[in-house]
């Protein structure tokens, strides 16, 4: 789609406003809305000025002017606003150089794709994330000097089987780890998920599947067709936006938080990925799991740099409450065909053109631009340096003898450990100027503040363990 096409859409659909969107460092969508009458072809060359100092982890107030540069290919109508509004995703551009801002996540993702092409290894990287989420009826939390708490509720939750309702208790509910995946009325979110899928398709995505997930209390998943790196990261933001707003319209609240419930499965973002060149899938071969040597080396790079990748792929303190044994979360850095206890799975496919790997440890607190770019850079490092991942692990990794378990590397056990790993293992990310040391340092500082805030906060469980000592 070209700027002329966008202007034609504005005319045909009688668009009143254009919503300029971008992702901050944390991956949260930000937006500023302008009248459609202010958008012309020059807007796609000159952009729109804005104050970058208000975005956490970006510029100081003394050098705050930045440019939102709309990408015409991302134009899509917003399905939620009252007035006809067109969404345009933007890159963040430095006014002095008119180049992508080095801390802009989308610009980093673009540089990763460009670097991949410059190596000659591949011309296409495909990503297919599976974003899991919960749908709750009520959520409350507080954290201040007088105390801290959180409370979630869902009419579907197993803990409500004994609750007295004015109109009677519906009775049909998935229990703990019982949501995957009985038909309605046990699955009470069929119609809501379908409404979400309808919205996603109206916004240009190709929905492949939707279903209830394992956990009680409304855990769900919507599968969307894979896409190239930057386009798929764009789609992840649109998917989260659509899911949360459709839930809101139904009087519900949706969250992609990795571990909102204690004692049941958390929300992951398993990321399927593959490389191609001249239309040929480079991951398809005749080695283990139908993989090529290139794919095995890509896996080797992911495993080698996994702890640094955790900083981008599991980008919250809450992420590491999910990455524990016993809840289908992959903590072992191993690969296997069809074995979901390994952190990297090779899905079974009939068509070699669909051959891919699935990296299972990420979650949706990741900024998709940064996470996908970082995984691509790790995989390329594995290919360039012929890093073999070792033998596949086809046994149940959740039930290993202690001596075998110790021999297998694991993902980080905390966010601060992941940030330390990123600080020490960053060279593979800075090749080709994809990530810069300045960006990584700013990310470490921003995320370190989250670690410090939680570390300094008294937790209710501490009262349970220590109050009476």
Swiss-Prot record:
Its main location: cytoplasm. Residues 105-469 form the GS catalytic domain. SUPFAM superfamilies: Glutamine synthetase, N-terminal domain (SSF54368), Glutamine synthetase/guanido kinase (SSF55931). It catalyses: L-glutamate + NH4(+) + ATP = L-glutamine + ADP + phosphate + H(+). Mg(2+) 1 binds at residues 130, 270, 358. Signal peptide: none annotated. Belongs to the glutamine synthetase family. This is Glutamine synthetase.
């Amino acid at each position: 789609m070209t700027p002329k096409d966008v202007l034609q859409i504005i005319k045909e659909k009688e668009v009143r406003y254009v919503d300029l969107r971008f992702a901050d460092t944390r991956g949260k969508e930000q937006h500023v809305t302008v009248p459609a009458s202010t958008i012309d072809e020059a807007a796609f060359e000159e952009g729109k000025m804005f104050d970058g100092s208000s975005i956490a982890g970006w510029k100081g107030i003394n050098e705050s002017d930045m440019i939102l540069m709309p990408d015409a290919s991302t134009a899509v109508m917003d399905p939620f606003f009252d007035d006809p509004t067109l969404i345009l995703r933007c890159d963040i551009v430095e006014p002095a150089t008119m180049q992508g801002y080095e801390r802009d996540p989308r610009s980093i993702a673009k540089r990763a794709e460009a670097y991949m092409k410059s190596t000659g290894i591949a011309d296409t990287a495909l990503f297919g994330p599976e974003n899991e989420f919960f749908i709750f009826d009520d959520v409350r939390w507080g954290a201040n000097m007088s105390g801290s708490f959180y409370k979630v509720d869902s009419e579907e939750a197993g803990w409500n089987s004994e609750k007295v309702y004015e109109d009677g208790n519906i009775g049909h509910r998935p229990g703990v780890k019982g949501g995957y995946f009985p038909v309605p009325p046990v699955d009470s979110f069929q119609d809501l998920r379908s409404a979400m899928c309808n919205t996603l398709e109206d916004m240009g995505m190709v929905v492949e599947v939707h279903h209830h997930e394992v956990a009680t209390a409304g855990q769900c998943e919507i599968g969307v067709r894979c896409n190239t790196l930057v386009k798929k990261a764009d789609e992840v933001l649109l998917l989260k936006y659509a899911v949360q707003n459709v839930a809101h319209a139904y009087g519900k609240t949706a969250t992609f938080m990795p571990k909102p419930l204690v004692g049941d499965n958390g929300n992951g973002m398993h990321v399927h990925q593959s490389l191609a060149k001249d239309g040929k899938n480079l991951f398809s071969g005749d080695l283990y799991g139908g993989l090529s040597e290139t794919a095995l080396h890509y896996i080797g790079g992911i495993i080698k740099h996994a702890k640094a990748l955790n900083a981008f792929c599991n980008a919250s303190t809450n992420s590491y409450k999910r990455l524990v044994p016993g809840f289908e979360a992959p903590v072992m850095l191993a690969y296997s065909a069809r074995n979901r206890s390994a952190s990297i799975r090779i899905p079974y496919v009939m068509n070699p053109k669909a051959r891919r790997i699935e990296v299972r440890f990420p979650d949706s607190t990741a900024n998709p631009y940064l996470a996908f770019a970082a995984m691509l850079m790790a995989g390329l490092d594995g290919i360039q340096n012929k890093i073999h991942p070792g033998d596949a692990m086809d046994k149940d990794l959740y039930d290993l003898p202690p001596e075998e378990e110790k021999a297998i590397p694991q993902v980080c056990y905390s966010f601060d450990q992941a940030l330390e790993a990123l600080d020490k293992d960053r060279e593979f990310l800075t090749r080709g100027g994809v990530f810069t040391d300045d960006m990584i340092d700013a990310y470490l500082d921003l995320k370190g503040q989250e670690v410090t805030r939680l570390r300094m906060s008294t937790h209710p469980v501490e009262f349970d363990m220590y109050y009476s000592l």
